[in-house]
A protein has these predicted regions:
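Non-catalytic cap/lid and distal C-terminal segments of serine-dependent acyl enzymes
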Residues: 1-280
Length: 280
């Protein structure tokens, strides 16, 4: 039940949560620094033939300038919505604080709605189409984003991590940075949610990208993180080993804890400073 006296809330996939923010976290607090803006954006999806929603973070100074920015697509989990990263995930405040501390470059962060139908698994292909055919073109039309591969990143948690793998490796020529939080190829270790039975295994479907040396050359970072108590730990480990087998250099870390926002916020704090870094 929502607290009617608490204005802070977060939309999940099927209900609302009341939020209580406990101060003290270095990069999650609301600090006296320049703040960007988070907008709720409606767009018409030609692939899904209906109006859809996403949240978009623009960094401090975006509205008053003409500069173009790199773009980071940040995907939510199966119990969440496009609102989740900017509310319970504190993504806007995290980015403000990282940018103010000069730990992360100013960037546009796009948080789309990962659910395209009643179930995430059965409708996964619909979201992938919506992402490539509608979300990316809409962002590049409406916002001053740099459109080359080296200035485009994607990451996601849980379901969003699986979507990052599906979209990222099917379109590896478009992304230089990929992050997978508490996720992997579902079913690869006999746990998690398996792929649809009428599809070949993920490794087979993506063989052209996995074994393409030209695509690997432009890929600057593949980053995985999972909690030691996460129910998808074996899935993450098996996915990392599979990618290494195909010659990918994967950064992998295991943290304390499980499948929780306590970890995912920390992963964003660690991942965002690695993006769009010319030294990589």
């Amino acid at each position: 039940m929502l607290d009617p006296r608490n204005p802070a809330g977060s939309e999940s996939n099927d209900n609302m949560w009341s939020l209580v923010v406990v101060p003290g976290a270095e990069f999650m607090d609301t600090k006296d620094v320049p703040h960007g803006a988070v907008a709720e954006v409606t767009y018409q999806s030609s692939s899904l033939k209906r109006a859809r929603r996403m949240h978009v973070y623009t960094p401090p100074g975006y509205e008053n300038g003409r500069k173009s920015y790199p773009v980071f697509y940040l995907l939510h989990g199966s119990s969440d919505s496009d609102d989740s990263w900017s509310s319970v995930g504190r993504a806007g405040f995290i980015m403000d604080n990282l940018i103010a501390a000069k730990k992360a470059k100013p960037m546009i962060v796009v948080m789309p709605a990962g659910h395209s139908g009643p179930t995430a698994i059965r409708n996964g292909k619909d979201f992938e189409r919506d992402f490539v055919e509608d979300i990316m073109p809409q962002i590049e039309k409406r916002y001053r984003v740099q459109t080359d591969r080296s200035n485009r990143a994607m990451a996601g948690l849980s379901m969003g991590g699986g979507q990052t793998l599906n979209i990222g490796f099917a379109n590896l020529d478009k992304f230089a940075y990929l992050g997978v939080f508490s996720s992997g190829v579902f079913g690869i270790a006999g746990g998690g949610r398996p792929a649809a039975t009428n599809e070949p295994p993920w490794e087979v479907r993506n063989k052209a990208s996995l074994d393409n040396p030209k695509l690997k050359k432009g890929l600057k970072l593949v980053w995985f993180a999972t909690g030691k108590d996460d129910f998808l730990l074996k899935t993450s480990r098996a996915t990392v080993e599979m990618l290494k087998k195909h010659g990918f250099s994967v950064v992998y870390k295991e943290s304390e804890g499980g499948h929780t926002w306590l970890n995912w916020r920390d992963y964003l704090i660690e991942f965002a400073p690695l993006l769009f870094n010319e030294s990589r």
